[in-house]
Design a protein with these regions (language model features):
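Extended, helix-rich architectural segments
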Residues: 1-155, 163, 475-481
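C-terminal amphipathic alpha-helical
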Residues: 102-116, 120-121, 259, 263-264, ...
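Extended, regular secondary-structure scaffolds
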Residues: 112-114, 119-238
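Extended, charged amphipathic alpha-helical segments
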Residues: 204-365, 414, 418
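Long, compositionally biased
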Residues: 268-271, 278, 370-386, 392, ...
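Short, amphipathic alpha-helical "recognition" segments used to contact nucleic acids or chromatin
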Residues: 426-436
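Short, charged amphipathic recognition helices of the HTH superfamily
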Residues: 436-446
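Long, highly charged low-complexity segments enriched in Glu/Asp and Lys/Arg with interspersed Ser/Thr
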Residues: 447-475
Length: 481
């Protein structure tokens, strides 16, 4: 597909606004929002001042940085399980590794965090049967949702380019299971002309719906999942969620451009003379024809002045720099810190990459902050990944005739483990609480082992039956061992 394409814009006002705003967020992610910043500066300070500032530079993008910072759920492979068929779960996990699904999932999380939605298609090559997880940004998607589950599509349209009559054209690929008895997949051009047979050589409607996208009972399903940045989305699309972060990114970029302008034009003291001229200067004409005195020199030069009129008092003086760069930089960095907090990141979650305690530039998550973010985001993405696991098992069954369960899969994400020091500190604190009677034994075991209280209770019951349960808690030194 050509790389220099322009995405079609939906004809409706709401659809057009959604796509245009989503594309702004994507330009921020890809570092191609220079023109957006130029327009913002002109609208904010006027064309004359904007021209005086010069071309703005993209020195920071908090929206992109925050989206990438919190996308830590797929730093390691997730565990796939099934209560009734562990072997099937292992096969799904193995297929994901072959597909390199984790890297696609992580990229999808970045898109989801920044644009609030992302499309993930489980594509099965009709010729080879190979599976691939396609990632599609929401500016290329439209669809209709299940009324009872507003975040789950029953019809999805993807804008993409196909070769038709030896040239690339924009088409809409429509997948629909609104009517389970009459599902269809169609390729339509801009005039709604059906190009399915020209592109694929056949139609996919009703009984011709691809068998690989049918469940064991014959019901069709969409090989798509739309991830959302919230656990219970109220609609299929929510493009303006966290608009404050996008606006703040524009504001701090404008502030950065102004600081750069002041650094270049107003960071030095202003020296003035009256009725004096540097000795040895040469008279020249300026661009407007007025006379000017020119003298070659630098900061190490010692200048001598001579009066122009012996009858008039000669004077020289100096004004301070016109811009207080330290104050400007302090306000700029504090605003960056507020943007991070508006994303839900507390100061305890962050580790600074500079020795200046006031600075909020180049923040990254601490180990505890990473675990906290993983725990907060897991309930949001788990339903989507469990749905993807079920789709994967279903497609595998159609391909190899297997009988794997086609629902009921469970996803557990691999949280960042505690460091040795963190584990020892946790054990000391937990045992101290247990010795004081502030927490029961199952809670203490759950905290130390990193499991649930129910699982810890089962372990304690098993230890009691085996007669290996200690009658008193170990000391902190014993726990460290």
């Amino acid at each position: 597909m050509p790389s220099d394409y322009v995405t079609p814009i939906p004809p409706t006002r709401m659809g057009s606004a959604r796509v245009r705003h989503t594309q702004l967020r994507l330009r921020m992610l890809h570092g191609t929002w220079h023109d957006d910043l130029r327009r913002h500066i002109r609208q904010s300070v006027g064309a004359v001042r904007a021209k005086a500032w010069g071309p703005p530079q993209l020195t920071a993008c908090p929206a992109r940085d925050l989206a990438e910072t919190v996308s830590v759920l797929y730093d390691d492979d997730a565990a796939v399980s099934h209560a009734l068929d562990p072997r099937a779960a292992a096969q799904v996990a193995e297929r994901w590794q072959v597909m390199q699904a984790r890297s696609a999932m992580r990229q999808a999380q970045v898109y989801t965090e920044l644009t609030n939605e992302c499309g993930r298609q489980l594509y099965v090559d009709p010729e080879t049967g190979r599976m691939r997880l396609r990632i599609v940004t929401p500016d290329l998607l439209d669809g209709l949702a299940d009324p009872l589950r507003p975040g789950v599509p029953v019809e999805l349209t993807e804008w993409c380019q196909r070769v038709v009559r030896d040239r690339w054209v924009w088409v809409r690929e429509v997948w629909s299971v609104r009517d389970l008895d009459a599902p269809f997949y169609r390729v339509l051009d801009g005039d709604d002309l059906d190009l399915t047979e020209q592109v694929h050589g056949r139609r996919y409607e009703g009984g011709d719906w691809p068998d690989v996208y049918r469940r064991a009972d014959g019901r069709p399903f969409l090989p798509w999942d739309i991830t959302h940045s919230v656990a219970q989305p109220a609609a299929l699309w929510n493009p303006w969620y966290r608009i404050e972060t996008i606006d703040s990114t524009m504001v701090v970029a404008r502030h950065s451009a102004y600081i750069d302008h002041c650094m270049t034009q107003a960071a030095n003291p202003q020296r003035c003379v009256y009725n004096m001229a540097p000795a040895g200067s040469q008279r020249r004409e300026a661009d407007d024809g007025s006379p000017v005195a020119v003298l070659q020199g630098d900061a190490s030069s010692v200048l001598a002045f001579e009066p122009l009129d012996e009858q008039v008092q000669a004077m020289q003086w100096q004004w301070d720099a016109g811009a207080e760069l330290g104050t400007m930089q302090d306000v700029y960095e504090r605003r960056l810190g507020l943007i991070a907090q508006s994303w839900g990141l507390s100061p305890d979650d962050l580790v600074r990459q500079t020795s200046d305690p006031r600075s909020s530039i180049a923040l990254s998550l601490s180990r505890s902050g990473t675990r906290e973010v993983q725990q907060r985001r897991a309930p949001v993405y788990r339903p989507h990944d469990e749905r993807l696991a079920a789709m994967t098992a279903t497609c595998m069954n159609r391909l190899d005739g297997g009988t794997r369960p086609e629902s009921g899969y469970r996803i557990e994400y691999a949280l960042l483990p505690l460091s040795t020091g963190e584990q020892q500190q946790l054990e000391r604190e937990t045992l101290a609480l247990y010795d004081r009677g502030l927490i029961p034994a199952e809670v203490a075991v759950a905290r130390i082992m990193g499991t649930t209280p129910d699982a810890a209770r089962a372990q304690l019951d098993q230890a009691r039956r085996a007669g290996t349960l200690a009658t008193s808690s170990p000391t902190a030194e014993e726990a460290d061992q």
